[in-house]
Amino acid sequence: MGKPTLLEPGHLYNVPAEHKNDIPIHYIITWIKQRLPEFGGAIPTSLADRVLIIKSRTGSGKSTALPVHVFRILRNENTHSFQKYLGRSVICTQPRVLTAVTLAKDIGASTHYPDMILGQTVGYQTKPLTEKPNRGLIYATAGVLLAQLHTMTDDEIASRYAFMIIDEAHERALGIDLMLMYIKSMLERMLQRGSIGALRIPFVILTSATIDTHKYSTYFGIGKENIILVEGRQFGVETHWPLYNTNNYIKTACETALTIHKENIHDRPTEADILIFMPGMGEIRFLSTLLNNANMDLAKEKLPLMLILPIDSEAIAQENEAYLGLKAEIKNLWVKNPLTAKVEKPLRRVIVSTVVAETGLTIETLKYVIDPGWNRSVETYYPEWAGGLITRPAAQSRIEQRKGRVGRVFPGHFYPLYTKHVFEQIPAQQYPEIITEGPGAIFLNIVVETIKKNKEGVFKAEEIDMLDPPPTDALASAIERAIVGGLLTRGEKGLQLTQLGDIASRFSFLSIEEARMCFSGYFWQAAISDIAIILAVVSVVDKKLTNLLDSKQRNGAMLAEAVLAGIPPFLQHIDNAYTNIHLLLADDLLEGLFIFEGFQHAIVYFINNKVNNLAKHLREWCEKKMLKYSSMVQILARREDILNELAIVGLNPFHQWQNRLASANAETFLKRVCTLKQCIYEAYRLNCFCYDEHRLLYTGRNGIHFSYHDTVIKNPSCIVTPRIMLAPVSKQYMEWRLEPSFVSVLDGFVNMDINFLLPRQEIPNILGGVEDEEEEEPPLPIQVFLHNYVKTHFHFSGKSFKELKMKPSQMIKFPETTLINMIPDIPKNVVQTYLEINVCHQYSFKRLIYCETFYTNMDDVQHENAVELIGLPMAAHHLTINDFNKLYRVLKPDGFLIVYDLHNSQEAYWLHSLQDALGHHTIRRDMDFHTITEWETIFKECGFSPIFSKQPSEHELFIVFKK
């Protein structure tokens, strides 16, 4: 086995010429020591003294040799291993559990590092698995360090860690981007404290094989001298490009693996394994079935067999048979002959894996990689806030990582299932999750960190200091949800956290909606344990409740049995129990609550009976109920996380324990159902949808619609769902439809705030007539302001507003409640909120009037603020005559009035309201006005002069009057 290139001379580049032939690790350690005061270096004064970027190709030892040698800076290499290390630690973050655990175990078992002993000087810390020393080299998932940065002070972090190594820094998960934001802010704060803070400031090292060095160095404000480039593997990797693309990559992957196996039948078992990447577990199962069938053919031909190992995050967490087979030596493994049923030694392992095997994992027997070139990740689309798992071509950087799994200890082979031309067309880097998903659960963390840097203590969007800020539409949607959830409010100087927002910002892993539901639980006196279970079900279960069932033949009967296992005793003996409970609850989330309650009953039963191997009995119970054991365990863990989060911030996680829904009786059951539904509604009320009897669809305020059918509950008038999912229409074509994830029926359970059902529309081109692509769009005053403001303050990932080539009305698509709130310091003389007036019938979008000052209600309208009104089409609900009186009373002296698309039956209502408001001439209600002249005549009698008018068609007109 060759040494990692970090330990061999002559692999450095982008360094001074006299150091080209240095051993890379020696050069790196010397570079670091020169900047440490304890080794004679100066006290750090800038980030350049504490941030180093190492772009080191796969196979160089950046995940193994580098952390060990950095740790040896702190612990003398010659120190006896039995002497306990008491200094500060080195933390090396990994994007996945598998790599963190594997690297720590491999280093602890390696003869190359006798001073690194697992549990004493090296260890791992992940959410599900931990074995680490109090001080030493700690491999951890990024989430572990993120949680510490979120909850600990700068000094606490500095006293714990001397070095932070962010391995695979090119990964752009939300947590990693937030972690880098935290780290940068911490370093800046400690540097601002002068020598007192700078002496113990941690050293940060970013490592990756495919990192964009320019982007990261610019973000941290460091120069080229802080970037070290190291060559990678010593052994070549041959790429076998196909002549044609495939239209069935699973079948082609199987055929390719079988061809490799047959053509290389004389491979040594220690240099023979195949790794195949698949985008998801469904594809892994399908491919594993095909490969096992191929083993049957091999057995018939009396050829050596393959051992098929399906690997994903679940297999790693459970350390199942496949994972143990991955970690074992090939000589100790056996495979069953499908013909003779006898066991025999396999020639090679075929590892079928998701992206968990993409980075930081070394399989020393791996010789071949087969890559279909796909990647599956969550994408969310705003402002509709609809998302789902989308399968797209993997970026070139990810493909290089996959290719880098081979060629580490002997030459390897890479088999892409796409042509070289296709590879050259796909993006070089993956899109960051903050772009594809939006800020999501980390939004409040971003707000808090941004507020810390603002002298006035307010949140300003343009001050977000991240590698890539959230997209404007995603940011606007997040602000809206935070305001509606009561976590953000507008102060005199900008957006500020409310008291609830301050509490919510202390949560490490709770989203806006999760925090709001917990707060609502305390307000409505709900059992917080029930709230935690509901949120855990939403977090773990994908799309619908039947996905909890561990069976290909999922059906209502299986789901019914699982639900009935957890219902209150008084309901267990009624006829048609599930049907009646389904009618009674009208709620997928509450049914999920009962499914988990049944699982909890089983836990209590087995514990009370003192069974041996509790996990085995629970797994058997889940198999009997057709439930996924792994999902139930994840719900249990997530529920505990939520309850712990509440306890950490000082809230009682056992609040109203005695009022749990599962313990209700006939008298209290419906009351508790209503209470929980109220909490669900308050958390997700922006996702309310009403049934449109004419279109036979559910429509919401976002302008989106979907169909929803329940076999028992027929077309409820109003439902709420935690999220809108993108569901594939067919496997053959990349087409998607919208569908709710879980449904909670509100009819008769919750008194809704109807204002949250107002649809949102794009700002139209009112004054410009029909849009002509050849002509510049005449912008509205509000658009002019936003155009100039956005052009000045938002950069859109490096592109100016002009470069985007978007017209204002195309650009500004924000909901009415956030169009202005997203811009924290908007001048007072610019429009800041809206007052809705309904002048339309059921199916038309008519108008929205907004004023120049933020009003909490109509009573706050003052004359001097109502200088100008501009009409926009927007559906709204009826205001009362008193509301009209208040509005037009302040308009009478010098205001504008707009008539837009008013005709037929609605004119009587409008004119009657206007008559009462203005107190002018009697207006005949039976008059039908269809022309500009007719409208001008009647409003002239009321003291208004037309200053602009247009009538595109018989039933469309637009008039601006001035008092």
Curated annotation (Swiss-Prot):
Motif (DEAH box): 167-170
Membrane topology: Single-pass membrane protein
One GO location term (cellular component): membrane
GO-annotated molecular function: ATP binding; ATP hydrolysis activity; RNA binding; RNA helicase activity
Enzymatic reactions: ATP + H2O = ADP + phosphate + H(+)
InterPro entries assigned to the protein according to its UniProt record, in alphabetical order: DEAD/DEAH_box_helicase_dom, DNA/RNA_helicase_DEAH_CS, Helicase_ATP-bd, Helicase_C-like, P-loop_NTPase, SAM-dependent_MTases_sf
Keyword 4Fe-4S: no
Localisation per UniProt entry: Host membrane; Virion
Principal location listed in the UniProt entry: host cell
Transmembrane regions: 521-541
Binding positions for ATP per the UniProt entry: S56, R57, T58, G59, S60, G61, K62, S63
Assigned EC number: 3.6.4.13
A Pfam family of this chain: DEAD
Family per record: Belongs to the DEAD box helicase family. DEAH subfamily.
Identification of the protein by name: Putative RNA Helicase B962L
Organism from which the protein derives: African swine fever virus (isolate Tick/Malawi/Lil 20-1/1983) (ASFV)
